[in-house]
């Protein structure tokens, strides 16, 4: 935050690093406040690190944020007495407010935790206080973080031009955020040009359904085509059935390797698609994938999810064969993950859904798919990865 007198350091680690080395690095920085980002792939690691950090830095203030703690923030604080609080949902403005509370400031000295939306925190008397969720922010207000590209050498660049999702897929947290917002195209063009000028190898768009708004998608794809540097690749997650003729014609004209498309089919069982609240026109998916493949210039990655409701082993074989027949460049078989806060979690009893207690909460069995069939599909997953 520009109006707060605080020094912020970004410390990035991976779950493959030695825990002791990370702990030593955190300790050497001697921060007064530490914030951890919590995701499905790092939650166990982060919780263990929080406990260790508090043992060696007893006076440090520790906050957590991210999707893995946003939807059960009270339980997280109960489980981790080392935590002062949890940031729920979007963190940009919430973090800035926390900096005002804890930073060395004068004009905002009256600000207290009780006035900040989007947090759950431990009160001085030990009780847990929960504030309302923060109103979704204007995406054009999100700062651009890639000014110093030396810090991101040999790394994939993750970039966002929209938040929220128009769909309601029951297994996905994006369906909770119904307020679909887009970043200003002027900002997007400037930032894309920055990546192109620096000749970054890949920019991965994290928009949940990039082509849900035709004008937005076309403007960005046209800019990428017209300013192609011959090096940078752009990755998009799209709904293939939403692609229209104009978009497909443009995609077919692009340099081989300029963009790649990830298409989540998940299942071709109509009962499954209906039950998970997904909207998909399979024949249009098939037709559009074929039209793009015909030109041979675009890498297409298609996804399936095992363990969805109404999908038994026989049904999944058909889904697999249907997607395989589309001849994608890559077919990925994943397994249902029952995410906190998702509708799938609410329906676990009705679906007789059994899943692992630890992240990533992967399915073990359902009313339609016994564990013996999950084992068989695991073998298929390994073969798909190899070949």
Language-model regions, residue ranges each:
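A short, sequence-level motif marking secondary-structure junctions
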Residues: 133-139
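Radical SAM [4Fe-4S] cluster-binding motif and immediate context
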Residues: 140-294, 298
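Residue-level signal for the nucleotide or nucleotide-sugar donor/cofactor binding architecture
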Residues: 17, 90, 183, 212-215, ...
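Conserved C-terminal portion of the radical SAM core fold
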Residues: 33-35, 61, 196-206, 231-237, ...
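Short helix-loop-beta junction
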Residues: 1-7
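Glycine-rich beta-alpha loop elements in corrinoid/cobalamin-binding modules
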Residues: 9-133
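Short, solvent-exposed turn/loop segments enriched in Gly/Ser/Thr/Pro and often Arg
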Residues: 13-14, 39, 208-212, 240, ...
């Amino acid at each position: 935050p520009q109006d707060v007198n605080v020094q912020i350091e970004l410390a990035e680690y991976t779950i493959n690093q030695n825990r002791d080395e990370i702990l030593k690095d955190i300790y050497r920085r001697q921060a007064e406040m530490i914030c951890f980002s919590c995701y499905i792939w790092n939650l166990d690691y982060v919780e263990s690190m929080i406990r260790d950090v508090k043992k060696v830095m007893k006076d440090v203030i520790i906050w957590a944020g991210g999707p893995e703690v946003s939807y059960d923030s009270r339980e997280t604080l109960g489980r981790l007495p080392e935590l002062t609080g949890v940031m729920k949902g979007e963190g940009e403005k919430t973090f800035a407010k926390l900096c005002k509370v804890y930073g060395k400031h004068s004009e905002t000295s009256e600000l207290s935790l009780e006035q900040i939306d989007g947090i759950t925190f431990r009160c001085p008397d030990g009780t847990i206080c929960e504030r309302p969720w923060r109103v979704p922010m204007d995406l054009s207000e999100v700062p651009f973080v890639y000014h110093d590209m030396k810090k991101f050498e040999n790394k994939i660049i993750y970039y966002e031009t929209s938040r929220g999702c128009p769909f309601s897929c029951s297994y996905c947290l994006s369906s909770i955020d119904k307020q679909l917002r887009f970043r200003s195209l002027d900002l997007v063009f400037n930032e894309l040009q920055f990546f192109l000028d620096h000749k970054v190898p890949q920019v991965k768009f994290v928009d949940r359904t990039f082509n849900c708004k035709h004008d937005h998608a076309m403007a960005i794809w046209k800019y990428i085509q017209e300013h192609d540097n011959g090096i940078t690749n752009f990755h998009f997650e799209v709904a293939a059935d939403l692609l229209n003729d104009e978009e497909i014609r443009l995609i077919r004209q692009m340099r081989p390797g300029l963009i790649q498309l990830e298409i989540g089919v998940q299942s071709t069982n109509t009962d499954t698609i209906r039950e998970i609240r997904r909207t998909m026109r399979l024949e249009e998916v098939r037709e559009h994938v074929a039209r793009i493949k015909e030109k041979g210039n675009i890498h297409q990655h298609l996804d399936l999810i095992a363990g969805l409701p109404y999908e038994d082993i026989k049904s999944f074989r058909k889904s697999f064969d249907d997607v395989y027949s589309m001849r994608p460049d890559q077919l990925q078989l994943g397994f249902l993950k029952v995410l906190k806060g998702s509708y799938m979690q609410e329906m676990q009893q009705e679906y007789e859904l059994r899943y692992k207690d630890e992240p990533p909460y992967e399915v073990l069995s359902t009313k339609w798919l016994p564990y013996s069939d999950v084992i068989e599909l695991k073998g298929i997953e390994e073969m798909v990865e190899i070949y």
